[in-house]
């Protein structure tokens, strides 16, 4: 019985990752160009679903970088690159919604803020 449990655990952990391990993971476009890194993952406390990731883009050593909220369902993990793939170019990302230093963190949970974000990307909202 211990062998069965060990095998089950191995299968489950092959596709699971701790949220804190996602922070700092590379995000690339399908051509393999680096778009940025995941800064944090935002979870819906009530549903338990991942809402979106905040991605750091540009800058040097964190200075001058933009932070973009990216709907989680647009990111795909690619074991070949050891990171996430986002089907956007750098120029598309430059025109995307961003978070500035004055952003009210309470707005993360504001549906009036989230709906335009998902519309911008043409993504299905996680709450649907």
What are these regions (language model features)?
Residues 1-128:
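Peripheral interaction segments used for macromolecular assembly
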């Amino acid at each position: 019985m211990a062998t069965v449990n060990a095998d089950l655990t191995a299968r489950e952990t092959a596709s699971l990752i701790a949220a804190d391990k996602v922070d700092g993971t590379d995000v690339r476009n399908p051509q393999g160009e680096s778009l940025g890194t995941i800064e944090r993952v935002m979870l819906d406390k009530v549903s338990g679903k991942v809402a979106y990731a905040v991605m750091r883009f540009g800058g040097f050593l964190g200075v001058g970088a933009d932070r973009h909220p990216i709907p989680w369902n647009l990111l795909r993990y690619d074991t070949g690159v050891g990171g996430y793939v986002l089907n956007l170019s750098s120029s598309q990302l430059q025109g995307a919604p961003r978070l500035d230093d004055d952003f009210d963190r309470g707005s993360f949970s504001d549906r009036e803020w989230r709906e335009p974000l998902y519309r911008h990307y043409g993504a299905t909202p996680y709450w649907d």
